[in-house]
């Protein structure tokens, strides 16, 4: 049985059609879908449009920070927040009670609040029953008048066309379908958690369900229903419009898109993951063929089955002439977002919060400049010959370590650069079954770097351990092992408490690179079967080394005897978000392989000769070294120590001791946020640590300029630091290149924290406590929930949502030219997703971007552009 016939909507004869691969991947001509009334519904084109409003978050292993509201980037920031709130049912700003608490704590000052009120006006408060004559009365009204909390209303998925099944027919389809659909998806996409993998994994999702229905001894409800058999044999381009015509009504094709959007947003996590894997199938190590079209087809079939069970096969459509017209969708041009009074007040508080931080941040930098120019500074001696130079990732967590390291010796210099250090590659360690990407997400690397283990006995030992692990999970051998060696598991449990790194669930970037293995970075001209080149040519290496040195301004400084590239990673146990704690510029991987590779490149004599022809001279007395900093344990791992010349051994030992002291001070500084910690507890005695670190929490600013702007200045681990010498960039080309790389990465980190803190349940993942890992691709609440996107509250609870304050050291003319070099950069600053400022350091003038110009800030003025 299929959908019942009617005089107006004839049912086409079912056909067995194998669904084609996604048009985005195969490049095939798109199939259009014919509705029962003869009109055409372009399913694939429609789903491509709708996918824009879904979360764009890949599997856990590739967790990369991004702008949560990327789909609204074309709108000004505040308008985007309002539109997204109406679409997803999320908070637009923090609750008013939270802002009032921040005000009482001094995080919002009267000065900042007064400036915001004078600029934005407050007369509208009188119209809402709070008569005010000056800014103080307006402040008092904001503190005392009951405006509400600004609690968001329901999203489009809870009050749209599809929700009429519940509101008008009394059907709760979600509760009946979601658990079955999610289990099906989890089983099909599983990447190694399930002991028994999904059969027929080479098939597409729809073909997989067909095969199960036809061959399984047990019914796969609801898809095994006789009513759905004809629909199950159709391609999605046929079945989807056929079912929608019954649900929405024939001739109502404009509403098909709306129904599909509401259905996808009802489980946005799974929908977004399916779309990500459709356009990026390489995101799974064990690839699967999934598509939004097949997901929609399966869910609509399930809905149709349950609707027919409850209402019969003849039922009225959800929309008809007697139904009220549906309002425009929040992302459509005709939709006009109107803030509530509570949201208007919250916007004033939010602007005052950002202005308070901005005034404090800029004031510290100007005070630091005054001290430096007075000659009383002891932390920065520009005429002092460098003894050691260390390159760090521009990551905000590395700023405090750089400061503590520089404090050990005025001749120690540090530089900030994107943590992949220009080495765009995939990396495959000695124990890795698959290579992993180690460069920014938008790049498509063509080079592979491998490790080769020097000791073959370790390979044999690793293989034996893997075999024992597999055998322990089989029926017979697992039973024998548990009966004979089961007691050992209790001993291992106790050991894992006192030494957590023994836990098999531990993830550590220090173990990602085998310091005892050899790494080869040089290659010939042969390309491997999978399309990667095994290493780099000398010319390619020279390009990458020169790129780092030139962009950082080091070509204008003499090179020290020892130059260290310090990547960063992390270590944690049973943490699904381990990739979020590693280097974002390395696609959520530790930066150790990149640091090691660029050091090996810079030490090659052939590369140095090529660099010398380009004017980048590396003296023979200079040696490069790679290292990795574990930001959670504050430990350092060095690579290729056996290759360090004897002439540099004493200096290396001095540097290692300096780093040990710096990391001890850094760990102490990190602990200051734990208000109840006892100063008498030794870190080695604190074996229980519920939060390995706060990651990028509290990030708020980014400086692109010389180190002398902030050397010796504590920026509270809230600032990204990228090295740049404006004197070497008269045309702004280097700055434009840096901005194009830094703004999406740092801005994405900032905004993901912003929105995950703003609404921990819609934009964030909520508390980690009920989380379970689903198939190694995502996390869910409980056992049958939607995939959760964004960040958990344990990573954001100390974060204040502030838009990134980006300050570049450059003249206003060049700063403006650089940021207008690409349409994406213009979108970031013109729509107020970040705050863009420049500092003419010599003249001590600061400027802010406002509507295509750089406007000078008056002394003492905080911020002006509000987005």
Where in the sequence are the language-model features?
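Generic recognition of flexible, low-complexity loop/linker segments
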Residues: 367-381, 549-554, 561, 685-692, ...
């Amino acid at each position: 049985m299929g959908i019942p016939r009617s005089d107006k909507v004839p049912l086409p004869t079912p056909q067995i059609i194998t669904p084609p691969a996604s048009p985005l991947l195969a490049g095939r001509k798109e199939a259009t879908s014919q509705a029962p009334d003869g009109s055409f519904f372009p399913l694939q084109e429609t789903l491509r449009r709708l996918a824009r409003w879904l979360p764009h978050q890949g599997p856990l292993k590739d967790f990369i920070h991004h702008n949560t509201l990327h789909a609204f980037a074309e709108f000004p920031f505040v308008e985007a927040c309002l539109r997204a709130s109406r679409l997803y049912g999320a908070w637009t700003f923090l609750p008013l009670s939270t802002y009032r608490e921040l005000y009482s704590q001094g995080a919002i000052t009267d000065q900042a609040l007064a400036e915001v009120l004078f600029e934005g006006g407050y007369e509208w408060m009188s119209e809402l029953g709070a008569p005010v004559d000056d800014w103080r009365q307006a402040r008092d009204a904001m503190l005392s008048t009951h405006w509400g909390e600004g609690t968001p209303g329901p999203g489009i998925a809870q009050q749209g066309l599809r929700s009429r099944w519940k509101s008008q027919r009394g059907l709760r389809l979600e509760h009946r379908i979601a658990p079955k659909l999610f289990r099906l998806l989890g089983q099909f996409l599983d990447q190694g958690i399930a002991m028994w993998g999904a059969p027929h994994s080479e098939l597409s999702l729809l073909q997989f369900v067909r095969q199960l229905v036809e061959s399984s001894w047990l019914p796969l409800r609801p898809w095994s229903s006789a009513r759905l058999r004809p629909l199950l044999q159709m391609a999605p381009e046929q079945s989807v419009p056929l079912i929608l015509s019954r649900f929405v009504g024939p001739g109502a094709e404009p509403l098909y898109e709306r129904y599909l959007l509401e259905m996808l947003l009802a489980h946005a996590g799974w929908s977004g993951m399916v779309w990500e894997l459709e356009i990026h199938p390489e995101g799974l190590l064990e690839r699967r063929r999934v598509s939004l079209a097949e997901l929609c087809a399966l869910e609509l079939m399930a809905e149709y089955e349950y609707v027919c069970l409850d209402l019969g096969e003849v039922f009225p459509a959800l929309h008809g002439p007697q139904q009220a017209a549906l309002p425009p969708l929040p992302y459509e041009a005709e939709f006009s977002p109107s803030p509530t009074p509570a949201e208007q007040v919250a916007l004033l508080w939010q602007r005052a919060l950002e202005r308070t931080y901005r005034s404090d941040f800029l004031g510290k930098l100007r005070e630091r400049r005054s001290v430096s120019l007075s000659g009383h500074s002891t932390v920065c001696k520009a005429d002092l010959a460098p003894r050691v130079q260390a390159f760090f990732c521009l990551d905000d967590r590395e700023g405090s370590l750089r400061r503590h390291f520089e404090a050990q010796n005025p001749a120690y210099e540090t530089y900030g650069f994107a943590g992949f250090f220009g080495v765009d590659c995939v990396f495959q360690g000695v124990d890795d079954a698959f290579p992993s990407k180690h460069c920014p997400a938008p790049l498509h690397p063509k080079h592979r770097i491998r490790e080769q283990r020097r000791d073959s006995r370790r390979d044999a030992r690793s293989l034996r351990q893997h075999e024992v692990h597999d055998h322990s999970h089989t029926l017979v051998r697992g039973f024998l092992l548990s009966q004979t060696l089961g007691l050992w598991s209790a001993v291992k449990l106790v050991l894992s408490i006192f030494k957590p790194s023994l836990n098999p669930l531990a993830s550590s970037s220090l173990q990602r690179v085998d310091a005892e293995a050899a790494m080869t970075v040089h290659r010939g001209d042969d390309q491997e079967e999978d399309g990667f080149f095994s290493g780099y040519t000398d010319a390619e290496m020279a390009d990458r080394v020169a790129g780092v040195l030139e962009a950082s301004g080091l070509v204008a400084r003499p090179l020290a005897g020892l130059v260290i590239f310090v990547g960063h990673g992390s270590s944690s146990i049973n943490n699904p978000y381990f990739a979020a704690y590693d280097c974002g510029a390395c696609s959520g991987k530790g930066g150790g392989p990149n640091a090691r590779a660029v050091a090996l490149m810079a030490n090659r004599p052939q590369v140095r000769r090529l660099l010398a022809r380009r004017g980048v001279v590396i003296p023979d007395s200079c040696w490069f070294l790679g290292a990795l900093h574990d930001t959670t344990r504050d430990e350092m791992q060095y690579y290729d120590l056996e290759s360090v010349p004897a002439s540099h051994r004493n200096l290396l030992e001095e540097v290692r001791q300096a780093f040990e002291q710096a990391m001890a001070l850094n760990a102490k500084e990190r602990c200051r946020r734990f208000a109840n910690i006892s100063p008498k507890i030794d870190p080695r005695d604190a074996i229980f640590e519920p939060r390995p670190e706060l990651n990028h929490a509290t990030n708020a600013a980014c400086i692109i300029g010389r180190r002398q702007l902030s050397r010796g200045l504590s920026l509270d681990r809230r600032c990204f630091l990228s090295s740049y010498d404006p004197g070497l960039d008269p045309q702004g080309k280097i700055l434009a290149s840096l901005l194009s790389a830094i703004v999406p990465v740092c801005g994405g980190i900032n905004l993901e924290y912003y929105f995950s803190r703003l609404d921990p349940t819609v934009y964030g993942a909520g508390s980690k406590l009920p989380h379970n890992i689903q198939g190694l691709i995502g996390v869910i609440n409980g056992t049958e929930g939607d995939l959760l996107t964004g960040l958990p509250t344990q990573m954001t609870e100390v974060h204040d949502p502030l838009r990134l304050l980006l300050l570049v050291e450059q003249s206003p003319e060049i700063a403006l030219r650089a940021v207008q070099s690409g349409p994406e950069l213009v979108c970031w600053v013109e729509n107020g997703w970040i705050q863009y400022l420049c500092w003419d350091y010599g003249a001590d003038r600061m400027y802010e971007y406002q509507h295509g110009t750089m406007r000078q800030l008056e002394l003492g003025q905080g911020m002006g552009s509000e987005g």
